[in-house]
Swiss-Prot record:
EC number: 1.2.1.12
Site description Activates thiol group during catalysis, residues in chain: 180
Phylogenetic lineage: Bacteria, Bacillati, Actinomycetota, Actinomycetes, Mycobacteriales
Protein name (record): Glyceraldehyde-3-phosphate dehydrogenase
Principal cellular location given in the protein's record: cytoplasm
Amino acid sequence: MTIRVGINGFGRIGRNFFRAVLERSDDLEVVAVNDLTDNKTLSTLLKFDSIMGRLGQEVEYDDDSITVGGKRIAVYAERDPKNLDWAAHNVDIVIESTGFFTDANAAKAHIEAGAKKVIISAPASNEDATFVYGVNHESYDPENHNVISGASCTTNCLAPMAKVLNDKFGIENGLMTTVHAYTGDQRLHDAPHRDLRRARAAAVNIVPTSTGAAKAVALVLPELKGKLDGYALRVPVITGSATDLTFNTKSEVTVESINAAIKEAAVGEFGETLAYSEEPLVSTDIVHDSHGSIFDAGLTKVSGNTVKVVSWYDNEWGYTCQLLRLTELVASKL
């Protein structure tokens, strides 16, 4: 049975999710989209993408819909989710990717509008649960989890390697830095922003800013609560990021033992989520990689019981594929 999906917010993640469904899923079908932008613009941005390239199917539009490969997708432009008629399209799951309805108390309006489940594509508040596929997805409970979060792209990178390393060696405490591609929340030129660092031109600066990813790991790995913190360095690349984690273990380890633990996990139960590489990667090498986390074995460093590791991630496509896996899990339990 095909599960019917609605997307609220047809921006970077919304459009990437649409592409991921087309490319990778036989079980999901996007039947409706809500975005305040006009349909001509939405169809153009779906058809042509500066990172992903041209969509391999014909895209057309009219006043009420976008048609992709001959399939019509209804399009709405409602500011308030409660005014959406998901029921009219038999929508089962809504991907909430506007960035505005990260409070589950607001996002549950999608359920009131006819959907069965809501997945927020960002860190959330008041959600029923937060999941990183491959880390804690097996705790998903369809009876009690109706509005859930797929966490952030950085948490989806950090959590898989943190789980493996904590289970194997024990993380006492640690600090992380994500070297992160710039995003739409930054300014192209110097211009006002509530974060004065993000107010500076994104394409010519390294921009230090906050990330909640380290603390959010505790939502999917409670055993690490209070043990990790960190920040982000936004850099002038359009996508392709890396998470640097430095941590202390309970006993001395070696580069070889750290890498072996990750490699074993990557070829085993974490295969879709966590990859292991001994190649001399740079950021463009991992663009359009579907893993949430791509461990770079050549960058592992050890001094006594202090360890530094790095994992890459395509902060758009890799995260979207993680979101797709989570959506397929939810769909399988409807």
